[in-house]
UniProtKB/Swiss-Prot annotation:
CC terms in the record's Gene Ontology section: host cell nucleus; virion component
Keyword Transcription regulation in record: no
Cross-referenced Gene3D superfamilies: 1.10.287.230, S15/NS1, RNA-binding
Assembly with partners or alone: Interacts with protein M1. May interact with host nucleoporin RAB/HRB and exportin XPO1/CRM1.
Miscellaneous notes: Average number present in a viral particle is estimated to be 130-200 molecules.
UniProt motif (Nuclear export signal) ranges: 12-21, 85-94
Pfam families: Flu_NS2 (PF00601)
Domain of life, per lineage: Viruses
Family: Belongs to the influenza viruses NEP family.
Protein name in UniProt: Nuclear export protein
Keywords from the UniProt entry: Host nucleus, Host-virus interaction, Transport, Virion
Amino acid sequence: MDSNTVSSFQDILMRMSKMQLGSSSEDLNGMITQFESLKLYRDSLGEAVMRMGDLHSLQSRNGKWREQLSQKFEEIRWLIEEMRHRLKITENSFEQITFMQALQLLLEVEQEIRTFSFQLI
């Protein structure tokens, strides 16, 4: 995985964890958890692509990996919509920058997961 992407994930997760969004802190914690989950999933797909011989191992280990892939794309779409919504409602520039960078990172991760999955199909 690209070291810039790793630091981007870490930076955004750290900044999101420091935000105080009042009653929506549970939503924010959920977003942070999903971000971490997507990072791990993207990393595992990338590793499987690097070891193309692992495709059969991946499929036998997780017969439902296409279903899982579909679920991850749904999570990404939800997070993208949530980031867009947060960008519209927040007036705090720190939060705007964080959500904008998170949105950009989500779009990059979505593209990477698509690329990895096409290589595995």
